[in-house]
Curated annotation (Swiss-Prot):
Protein encoded by which gene: prpE
Disulfide bridge map: none
Keyword Nucleotide-binding annotated: yes
Record PANTHER family: BIS(5'-NUCLEOSYL)-TETRAPHOSPHATASE PRPE [ASYMMETRICAL], METALLOPHOSPHOESTERASE
Family, similarity comment: Belongs to the PrpE family.
Keyword vocabulary terms for this entry: GTP-binding, Hydrolase, Nickel, Nucleotide-binding
Reaction equation(s) it catalyzes: P(1),P(4)-bis(5'-guanosyl) tetraphosphate + H2O = GMP + GTP + 2 H(+)
Function as written in the Swiss-Prot or TrEMBL entry: Asymmetrically hydrolyzes Ap4p to yield AMP and ATP.
NCBIfam families: PRK13625.1
Organism listed in the record: Geobacillus thermodenitrificans (strain NG80-2)
CDD domains per the UniProt record, alphabetical: MPP_Prp_like
Name of the protein described by the UniProt record: Bis(5'-nucleosyl)-tetraphosphatase PrpE [asymmetrical]
Pfam family, one: Metallophos
Amino acid sequence: MHIDIIGDIHGCYREFTALTEKLGYVWDKGIPIHPDGRKLGFVGDLTDRGPESLKMIDIVCALVDRKLAHYVPGNHCNKLYRFFLGRNVQVTHGLETTVAEYRALPPSEQEMIRRKFIRLYEGAPLYAVLDEGRLVIAHAGIRHDYIGRMDKKVKTFVLYGDITGETNPDGTPVRRDWAKRYRGDAWIVYGHTPVEKPRFVGRTVNIDTGCVFGGALTALRYPEMTTVSVPSSMPHVPEKFRTFS
């Protein structure tokens, strides 16, 4: 299996286009296709905060429909899904940018994008186990003893990370560094927590290099285990990046 897994995009369509071209994909009829048959992987959080979230929904839906990509949802995807279902969610923490794009559309187009995203989300696995179990794509990561499980505890971990229930002074949840304790055989490729450069710890790789916060958009090439990045066009917000001891 040959796949290029892309970190949290958050509506950064311009950088996504540049990254796929750098990876050797050719854009045809609005989607990137690799001449050697490589597929794309997405760790979730396609939308929110960035300028072109709805375009990313369109593209990823088209890729998944054509079996050219593997997509797993992130916490922002989960919140957008609940918004589209009419649930009472707070339109904050970036969701407001996607909702503004959505509300600017004519009603017929609103319904089209709503249905499209609901279908994408409901058709996606919580996490993807690929290459006969040698590779797992999970938005915020996954413990080795959680692989194969789908219960509420696992869903919380996969969408939000190993949260303690406490909060940092800036309001973000305190998270344990689960990657340091991972002892599984499968490679875990994840995002969710922005880091200045791809973080390899054991057989885990965090590829969320904070594109929407002015970092970069990064892909991990599997099975080569090399990374490819393009710089962000967004303003740099250093306090959004996590450092590890």
